[in-house]
Amino acid sequence: MDQENSEEPIEFQISDELDLHTFRPSELGDLMPDYIGLCLQKNIFRIRIIHGKGIGTLRETVHGLLRKDSRVLRFKLADQAEGGWGATIAWLTHASSI
């Protein structure tokens, strides 16, 4: 089997931080809900999403997806110590039925 063409999923550790620097806005529609679901499975209820400062396209996409997700209680731009307007902090619901 050719290792370079392997379609095996890549496993990675879920943490309270998601760095989106390598993603395009069009890739976030599946990524963000999946990430939130995995965080809830790990009992992570406060997350930091790093979208960068740039022109704001990633930030706007992230905020739009957070607004639509019923598992998100609230969110805000991070304070300076956590990335300022280059990151967003979100609080997730503790309810397991959602």
Give the location of each predicted region.
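Long, charged, low-complexity intrinsically disordered regions
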Residues: M1-I98
